[in-house]
């Protein structure tokens, strides 16, 4: 009788343990499903906010580019445009991370070329503008 009692109790304990494991697995899978759904919702909201922010920044960058294209840019304006371009590259890299490094390298090379051209331009235009301003100043003194 003791043996039958021990077997019955062992069977009850094993079945209770199996049920608890099964319930744990079900609750974990339900929790995983709920977590996945909430992550999808968060990603959807984040994606919508990111796209809205990107479009707003692109509009701002276009507006600033048009403004600066029509007038002379100061050094501060140039820095602002560089920062905006960097932000736009960062935002684009969020959409396409595999292309980000390629674009960054390409942008660096273009920026390096532009800087060299600007340095050469300054070396040539600086003395020429100085001569023109001296000549105009001399003409104004003679007329006045």
From Swiss-Prot:
Function: Maximin-6 shows antimicrobial activity against bacteria and against the fungus C.albicans. It has little hemolytic activity. Maximin-H10 shows antimicrobial activity against bacteria and against the fungus C.albicans. Shows strong hemolytic activity.
Predominant location: secreted
Organism: Bombina maxima
Asparagine amide modifications at: 70
Protein name: Maximins 6/H10
GO cellular component, one term: extracellular region
GO biological process, one term: defense response to fungus
Annotated propeptide span(s): 19-43, 74-123
Keyword Signal: yes
Subcellular location: Secreted
Tissue expression from the record: Expressed by the skin glands.
């Amino acid at each position: 009788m003791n043996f039958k009692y021990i077997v019955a109790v062992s069977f009850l304990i094993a079945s209770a343990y199996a049920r608890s494991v099964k319930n744990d697995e079900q609750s974990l899978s339900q929790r995983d499903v709920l977590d996945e759904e909430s992550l999808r919702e968060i990603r959807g909201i984040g994606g919508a906010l990111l796209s809205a922010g990107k479009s707003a920044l692109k509009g701002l960058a276009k507006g600033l580019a048009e403004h600066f294209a029509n007038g002379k840019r100061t050094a501060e304006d140039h820095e602002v445009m560089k920062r905006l371009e960097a932000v736009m590259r960062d935002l684009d890299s969020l959409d396409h991370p595999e292309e980000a490094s390629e674009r960054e390298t390409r942008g660096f090379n273009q920026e390096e070329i532009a800087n060299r051209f600007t340095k050469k331009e300054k070396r040539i235009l600086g003395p020429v503008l100085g001569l023109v301003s001296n000549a105009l100043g001399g003409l104004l003194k003679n007329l006045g």
